[in-house]
């Protein structure tokens, strides 16, 4: 990842109980320079940290951070709990706090993210971008609005809702005066048969997915953020998936990055997807996912990755039994 013009690399080896290795370097030149490296001593159950000179932290500060670095939290988290002087870690933490958009998976989380972004779009630039993107994607959407729905609830239901562990981002402006406030999108369509409006519940999943992706795309291009999306192709025609990725590649001039998973093999045939950016996942006997970069298979440049994968020459294909069920 990049902070300004400087390149950083953070490496982690961990499971649910321990962080076994954590290394942060940056590139003041063509060669990397160590900021810190932490290792987990399994025999003693202790964390050991080797500090690089570029951090310029005092021994007292290093000791304070080490004291807060327990086996299952990162050095960056321990740094936030320590009263130490400013260093390069300030910028690194700020990057992950503000420019890392983690995977948005559930439909309600996606909807909440899009609504929150558009609600805070005071100058209307995001909305203009979204409408142009959707129209360029062959949707006849002329406008997008956010409307507030009021639902009258009794005291018993109010108490029930207040006690529920609802997911973060489920946009409920909580139950004031016995009224439940819920926001939803309304889409205006312009067609040869006239204009009409549809609530988000009546739009197709593909339309809504493109709306969310357009919001993500705008924010990535503006903020230079890293965005992680699970199953990017969900509910999308392949041409729409391809259009989104090509638009990101063509428009991204800054440090923004897009990391995504997909089951759509058609991307293996595309020239705009660099082979060194493709990774295959497969489950080992212990159930853990193992990742292998396409370039590690030594595939000849004239051989199609798509055909090689279909022939089982790359990552193993899913083993399927008989289509006849006893």
PLM ranges: what are they?
Residues 20-26, 183-191, 279:
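Short polybasic amphipathic segments
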Residues 223, 243-326:
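C-terminal lobe/lid and adjacent interdomain/linker elements of RecA-like ASCE P-loop ATPase modules
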Residues 162-218, 232-236:
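Conserved ABC ATPase signature
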Residues 9-11, 175, 280:
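Short, surface-exposed charged micro-motifs
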Residues 7-9, 31-33, 193-197, 288-289:
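Short, mixed charged/polar active-site loops
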Residues 227-230:
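Catalytic Walker B motif of ABC-type/P-loop ATPase nucleotide-binding domains
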């Amino acid at each position: 990842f990049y902070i300004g013009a400087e390149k950083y690399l953070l490496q982690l080896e961990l499971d649910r109980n321990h962080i076994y290795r954590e290394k942060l370097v940056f590139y003041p030149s063509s060669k990397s320079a160590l900021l810190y490296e932490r290792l987990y001593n399994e025999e003693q159950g202790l964390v050991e940290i080797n500090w690089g000179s570029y951090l310029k932290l005092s021994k007292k500060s290093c000791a304070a951070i080490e004291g807060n670095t327990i086996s299952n939290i990162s050095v960056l988290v321990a740094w936030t709990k320590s009263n130490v002087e400013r260093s390069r870690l300030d910028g690194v933490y700020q990057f992950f706090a503000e420019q890392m958009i983690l995977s948005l998976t559930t439909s309600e989380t996606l909807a909440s993210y899009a609504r929150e972004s558009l609600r805070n779009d005071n100058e209307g630039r995001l909305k203009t971008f979204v409408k142009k993107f959707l129209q360029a994607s062959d949707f006849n959407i002329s406008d997008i609005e956010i409307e507030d729905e009021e639902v009258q609830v009794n005291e018993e239901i109010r108490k029930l809702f207040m006690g529920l562990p609802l997911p973060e981002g489920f946009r409920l402006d909580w139950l004031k005066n016995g009224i439940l406030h819920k926001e939803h999108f309304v889409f205006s369509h312009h067609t040869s048969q006239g204009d009409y409006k549809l609530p988000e519940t009546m739009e197709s999943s593909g339309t809504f997915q493109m709306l969310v992706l357009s919001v993500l795309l705008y924010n990535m291009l503006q903020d230079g953020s890293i965005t992680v999306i699970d199953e990017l192709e969900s509910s999308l025609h392949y041409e729409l998936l391809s259009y989104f990725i090509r638009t990101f590649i063509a428009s991204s001039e800054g440090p923004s990055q897009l990391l995504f998973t997909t089951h759509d093999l058609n991307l293996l045939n595309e020239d705009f997807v660099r082979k060194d950016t493709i990774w295959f996942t497969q489950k080992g006997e212990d159930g853990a996912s193992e990742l292998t970069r396409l370039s590690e298979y030594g595939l000849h440049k004239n051989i199609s990755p798509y055909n090689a994968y279909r022939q089982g020459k790359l990552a193993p294909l899913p083993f399927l039994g008989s289509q006849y069920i006893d």
